[in-house]
């Protein structure tokens, strides 16, 4: 009776410790500007997101909002017009604002799925001075 329990325990531990591609989810590994960074308008001509895996292009959705403006208390978030494109590597997305970003706080939201097809989402903010 001990042998089957030991074998099952060993198999369960091996499965738990083994890396699994199926359990991976798309997530942002880095961004430019970085989350919570303060940058000049010149350095905010594009926003780049780099993910941990190739994305399924039809699942990618991004948004860019201005959430704060100097001197304006309780600023209502405003959508910022932008174009976007996926990198040739399939792991990166570039947002290109149609107009230069003015001083203020911005929020990038994203949703995407990788090979496991689980749609993940996230957001980060940065400030333009």
Per-range role (PLM):
Residues 1-10:
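Bacterial N-terminal signal peptides that target proteins for export
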Residues 18-24:
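Sec/Tat signal peptide C-region and signal peptidase I cleavage site
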Residues 24-43:
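N-terminal edge beta-strand
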Residues 20, 32, 118:
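Short glycine- and Lys/Arg-enriched binding-loop motifs that mark or flank ligand-binding interfaces
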Residues 9-18:
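Bacterial N-terminal signal peptides
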Residues 39-43, 48, 53-126:
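Acidic, low-complexity Ser/Thr/Gly/Pro-rich repeat segments typical of extracellular/periplasmic
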